[in-house]
Regions:
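N-terminal low-complexity segments that are often proline-rich with Ser/Thr-Pro
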Residues: 327-331
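Conserved beta-strand segments that form the floor/walls of ligand-binding pockets within enzyme
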Residues: 94, 213, 319
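Conserved small/polar residues in nucleotide/adenosyl-binding loops
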Residues: 319-326
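An alpha-beta-alpha
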Residues: 314-315
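Iron-sulfur-cluster electron-transfer modules
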Residues: 128, 142-143, 148-308
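Ferredoxin-type iron-sulfur electron-transfer modules and their immediate structural context
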Residues: 1-139, 143-153, 159
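Short beta-strand/turn micro-motifs composed of small residues
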Residues: 99, 214, 321
Length: 331
């Protein structure tokens, strides 16, 4: 979480610069200047050189504009910032210094693939033979074998992360449920998400009726002094038509979902909630046999969206949330 603060600071700096240029109508002309302004040099701050750091900023600028970080867009809102990925040199199972090079060689005897060999001071695991079954780690009486994984891969609950031939992280769109756990797990900030801040600014400048909606949890992102009321006031001063707390949608959907669940209970059927997009994605992609159990009640965001559209058919809707799975532009 502490490492996450550094990444969030960089992300906010990029968003601020992009938004400032978009408001001024200068983004197209000065987009390439952002990387140089944020990384002036001559000394690098975090990486090997200022040129790598600037390329990372350029890819973050693309994300801020709602584009893919690289040249190919797979449609996923979660994106790998390839220039930031460090190709973490981590072998899954590694013999540590705790190895006593004992006579029993429980690790070697436990391995069915001949991947472990005795060494002068400790045993060694041949990564080309290792099947990552974990038997050696379980057998070692000294707990000298560590199971190491890249933070991004370890955090993914659906095994959607792998690596290409260059060691760069790849997200499998067919498996990804867009929960965003990988974004916060990477110590190098090599995974980010698209935003639609430029589209929103352009819509406001064009005089469209842009309404902002926010998840209740986002109130805590700005400190104790910032409330929904003060946030609403600030958003209207920026040019938004109005501001809605999506907690209202939670109240609306809770009533409908409770009724739906009561009817299902009478019929002996099972139901699961539809409020969390990541959860619904997980069910549909990884447990399709349970897809019919997902509640047909819309999410709180959709409920408030329909309410606003009913009141103003010309409304353009923006939803802000602290959850990556909610990063969806509502047109």
């Amino acid at each position: 979480m502490y490492a996450d603060e550094s990444m969030i600071k960089i992300k906010h700096e990029v968003l601020y610069e992009v938004a400032k240029l978009a408001w001024a109508g200068e983004l197209e002309a000065k987009r390439d200047n952002i990387a140089v302004e944020l990384i002036p040099g001559p000394q690098a701050k975090f990486r090997c050189c200022i040129y790598k750091e600037r390329e990372i900023i350029r890819q973050r600028v693309r994300l801020a504009e709602g584009k893919s970080a690289g040249p190919v867009d797979d449609g996923n809102v979660i994106q790998v910032i390839s220039s930031a990925c460090e190709d973490c040199p981590i072998s899954s199972y590694t013999v540590t210094e705790n190895c006593q090079n004992c006579l029993g060689k429980a690790c070697i005897n436990a391995c069915k693939f001949g991947a472990i060999e005795p060494g002068r001071t400790r045993s060694h695991i041949d990564s080309t033979k290792c099947k990552e079954c974990g038997k050696c780690a379980q057998a070692c009486p000294y707990n000298a074998i560590a199971h190491l994984q890249r933070p991004c891969k370890a955090s993914c609950p659906v095994d959607a992360i792998s690596y290409n031939e260059y060691g760069i992280t790849v997200i499998d769109e067919e498996k990804c449920i867009r929960c965003g756990k990988c974004i916060h797990s990477c110590p190098f900030g090599a995974i980010g998400s698209k935003t639609f801040i430029v589209s929103v600014i352009e819509a406001i400048k064009a005089g469209k009726h842009v309404y902002a909606m926010a998840a209740p949890a986002t109130e805590g992102q700005f400190g104790a002094d910032i409330t929904m009321a003060s946030w609403k006031k600030a958003m209207k001063e920026l040019g938004f038509e109005d501001f809605y707390d999506v907690g209202l949608g939670g109240d609306m959907t809770a009533a409908y979902e409770a009724q739906e669940w009561a009817e299902a209970y009478k019929e002996g059927k099972k139901k699961v909630t539809s409020c969390c997009p990541a959860f619904v994605n997980m069910v549909r992609k990884h447990y399709p046999e349970l897809a019919d159990c997902v509640s047909t009640t819309v999410s709180p965001m959709c409920a408030v969206s329909r309410l606003i559209k009913a009141r103003d058919p010309e409304a353009c809707l923006l939803y802000t949330s602290d959850a990556a799975d909610d990063l969806t532009r509502v047109d």
